[in-house]
A protein has these predicted regions:
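Short glycine-enriched loop/turn motifs at secondary-structure junctions
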Residues: 1, 55-60, 91-92
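N-terminal beta-strand motif that seeds the catalytic metal site of vicinal oxygen chelate
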Residues: 1-16, 61-63, 111-115
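Residue-level marker for the onset of beta-strands and adjacent loop->beta junctions
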Residues: 3, 33-34, 61, 94-96
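Vicinal oxygen chelate
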Residues: 11-13, 63-107
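Conserved acetyl-CoA-binding loop of GNAT-fold acetyltransferases
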Residues: 20-27, 81-83
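Conserved short beta-strand elements that form part of the metal-binding/catalytic scaffold
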Residues: 25-58, 107-112
Length: 115
């Protein structure tokens, strides 16, 4: 089981604003620190500052977060001025999801099983 994922950021303040606006619970760190940890369900998302961080390549993968209500998360993103790639969609593989990029270009997916 994966317990934590670490993403690199060029701007911790922008990342902190983004993840906290989406409701991620900060455990340690924050906008003025080089390392921040958020609780995500039973696991953790770490964000590590690297001011020289190059943009994320077009193909790198994505991090998927299971949420209770995909549509509510989508609306929360919109309320805070973030622009998801797509509206929530029911996929043929049995989940409802949408994608959103964080300030550093990491692709995030918010999903829930349909059944």
């Amino acid at each position: 089981m994966i317990n934590a994922v670490t993403l690199v950021t060029a701007d911790m303040a922008a990342s902190s604003t983004f993840y906290e606006a989406l409701g991620f619970e900060r455990v340690v760190g924050g906008p003025d620190t080089p390392f921040t940890t958020y609780r995500v369900g039973d696991g953790f998302l770490n964000v590590q500052l690297d001011p020289a961080h190059a943009p994320v390549p077009a193909i790198w993968g994505r991090v998927i977060f299971w949420v209770v209500d995909v549509d509510a998360m989508y609306e929360r993103a919109l309320v805070h001025g973030y622009v998801p790639e797509m509206e929530p969609t029911d996929a043929p593989w049995g989940e409802r999801y949408f994608h959103l990029h964080d300030p550093d270009g990491h692709e995030l997916s918010f999903a829930k099983l349909l059944s």
